[in-house]
Regions:
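A conserved regulatory-domain signal marking ACT and ACT-like small-molecule sensing domains
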Residues: 1-93
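Adenosine-phosphate binding glycine-rich loop
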Residues: 231, 235-236, 359-469
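Flexible, glycine/charged-enriched surface loops at secondary-structure junctions
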Residues: 40-43, 80-82, 183, 210, ...
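Glycine-rich phosphate/diphosphate-binding loop of Rossmann-like nucleotide-binding domains
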Residues: 151, 158-176, 228, 234, ...
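Glycine/serine-rich phosphate-binding loop and adjoining beta1-alpha1 elements at the start
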Residues: 79-262, 463
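NAD(P)-dependent Rossmann-like dehydrogenase/reductase catalytic/cofactor-binding core
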Residues: 2, 9, 55-58, 118, ...
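Rossmann-like adenosine-cofactor binding region
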Residues: 309-378, 384-385
Length: 480
């Protein structure tokens, strides 16, 4: 089934005859080229012609070009301009910095800047902890990238990564009211990245690492967290892993299996795959089998990469060997964070009863849901046009909201497990089913539930520096 790219719409300004016949020809030309007319807005009316803005949805650049050429061939129609609504949304960037207090009088100015601000600065100099109370630090997160692993685009560099980082900052604000700012670094050197983050950290309450390629991302996260006393999280690893675990908790309940008894095959050697395996093990899943292009990672092989060595030593308890297809025999769960179309229907038929398949390669999953449907009980993807979308937007806003609120010094495994449990618990026993194992990213209950769970876990583990009153409806906190 073909699917239109979300948000890919063109606004085409046309001068044309004012007859219905002319518009009918236009509609036919657009439809024949593969476009869909969503809206028509009149801009001006002349004696013999009208100017209209026609909004057209297209599935690809090829369809967009075909629509344009079809219109240009029409007699009596002049294509004045074409605008892409996605590009229009990015004009001038997508985020701004706005003051919380208006500055309209000398009194206002003296409070927010000189001379009054000097007293605030001296108070922080005397007690640096006051920065959490008196500056943006209490609610700010740096979204840091080097542009080496951006979405499915790969190494496109820091400047091209900026629109993605701006979008991430928008989501922080929209979903969790966190003030996030994009930091796009023009270096791929691990040491330089770490030093830069450490030096800019004083004004931030948390660090979100984003779209940094593996295996460098593991080392960068570890080194930065060792040197800072604020939470640091590589979202591509841990946000994804948290949501996968949340979905698996509910999927296991749907098929009536205990998490501890599952055999889970994980395909994907990048950041998300490694973090997912660690989360599964931390939750009690005992049999996790990692697979890369060469087959199952096992203890019979020697690996130059320390992360592969870790996988060999801590997973695949029966030391299975063979291809993905071979190790899927008898498996309960397949989790793919790898490449498109690597699974076949016959692979799914080898799995245990009521297979669970999370195929999350984007935009094309390891197997399409309509192909897998006859052979699986629960199916999830990373796409929004099928049920059970695994999207880390369910995790990172609430995780950072909770960490900032309790002033956590680190994001622990316990806090991430608490986040996964909170996401899973949004869906009740009555609601849970094969096509509903993970809530929508727009479910307004998610962020608050995750934040409360994360803050409570931080307090329990002794990494919270602020005690929250987390009773239902409470929003109070007391410094510890």
């Amino acid at each position: 089934m073909a699917s239109l790219a979300i948000g890919y719409t063109l606004i085409m300004r046309l001068e044309m005859a004012s007859s219905m016949g002319a518009f009918g020809s236009l509609a036919s030309a657009v439809g024949d080229a593969g476009g869909i007319i969503d809206a028509v807005d009149m801009r001006s009316v002349g004696k013999n012609a009208v100017t209209r803005d026609v909004t057209v949805t297209v599935a690809s650049d090829a369809v967009a070009n075909a629509v344009r050429k079809s219109i240009e061939r029409l007699e009596g129609v002049r294509l004045v301009s074409v605008s892409d609504s996605t590009f229009l949304a990015h004009l001038g960037g997508k985020i701004t910095v706005e003051p919380k207090i208006p500055v309209k009088t000398r009194t206002d100015l003296s409070k927010v800047y000189t001379p009054g601000v000097a007293r605030v600065s001296l108070a922080i100099a005397a007690d640096p902890a006051k920065a959490f109370q008196l500056t943006i630090k209490r609610n700010s997160v740096a979204v840091v990238t080097d542009g080496t692993a951006v979405l499915g685009l790969g190494d496109i560099g820091p400047l091209a990564a900026a629109p993605v980082m701006e979008g991430k900052c928008m989501l922080f604000k929209q979903f969790a009211d966190i003030d996030a700012f994009p930091i796009c670094l023009d270096t791929k050197d691990t040491g330089e990245i770490v030093e830069t983050i450490v030096r800019i950290a004083p004004i931030f309450g948390g660090i979100n690492l984003e779209d940094i390629s593996a295996p460098r991302c593991f080392e960068i996260e570890r080194l930065v967290q060792e040197r800072l006393d604020i939470p640091v999280m590589h979202d591509d690893q841990h946000g994804t892993a948290v949501v996968i675990l949340a979905a698996l908790i509910n999927a296991a309940r749907v098929v009536g299996k205990d998490l501890r008894d599952l055999t889970v095959v994980v395909a994907g050697s990048g950041a998300a795959g490694t973090a997912t395996m660690k989360m599964l093990l931390a939750k009690g899943v005992r049999d996790v089998i990692p697979v890369d292009r060469a087959g199952a990672i096992n203890r019979q092989e020697h690996y130059d990469n320390s992360h592969w060595t870790w996988r060999a030593e801590h997973t695949n308890r029966e030391n299975r060997r063979g291809s993905l297809s071979e190790v899927l025999k008898g498996a309960d769960v397949f989790i793919g964070v790898s490449a498109p179309n690597i699974l076949r229907p016959e692979d799914l038929q080898r799995m245990a009863r009521d297979p669970i398949v999370f195929a999350m390669a984007n935009p094309t999953p390891e197997i399409m849901p309509d192909v897998a449907a006859p052979f699986v009980t629960v199916m999830a993807t990373g796409r929004s046009d099928y049920p059970n979308q695994v999207n880390n937007l369910l995790a990172f806003p609430g995780i950072f909201r909770g960490a900032l609120d309790c002033r956590a010094s680190v994001i622990t495994d316990g806090m991430k497990l608490a986040a996964a449990d909170a996401i899973a618990a949004i869906i009740t026993d009555e609601e849970r089913g094969p096509e509903y194992v993970i809530p929508s990213v727009f479910d307004t209950r998610v962020v608050d539930a995750v934040a409360r769970a994360v803050a409570a876990a931080a307090a329990e583990e002794g990494v919270a520096r602020r005690q929250l009153m987390v009773a239902e409806g409470e929003d109070l906190a007391a410094p510890v």
